[in-house]
């Protein structure tokens, strides 16, 4: 069994070296890391090449032209032979963001928990396990020890109908077994997917099982370039967020609410067609 990690970078030079060091320093040593750069204009690919030169477990690739979005880049590389092979039925799969920082035991703990899930449900069942994370500032100062509690999320809400309207699975927190990855490779994530992690959670809920490891296993860095950041949750703020009511005017509220629900409906319709 090998753990296969996919890290897609774009303009990541500020934090990429720290994240690579955290992955290379994992207590679980049996892994392969595919680092794909999205035609970054900065030093991201040079950092990736240096990692590949010093560590045989790392493969560095670079797109000639930018993909246009982080989600599209990730989904394209899912099917890359350097990441997924249909023959390697015992492998596990993880994603990494370029600006996170893994705790030394992240991989070991998630592998152990996934093995326990496979013993319980069987390795042929599509399985996804996700963990908690620590929210930190750009310089690594702790903002919250638990992302789940900071956002007032409930990982127990793992049924398909619940995840359809509110995702609580973060891409960098996931580990997936081969059965789930085989489904994702066979049925590409559509353009209408809200985010790749949301779609993957829906697939796991519909066709397999989702587990949660209640332990923060990496640092989720908040800075100006985050695609999606962590914001403190609460009953009122959560209601406003779900309804898109964070605009300053009624028109903005209506537009945001309409756009949010259209995206969810389109994703649900796409899933039905699949």
Stretches found by the model and what they are:
Residues 159, 273-274:
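Helix N-terminus capping/helix-initiation residues
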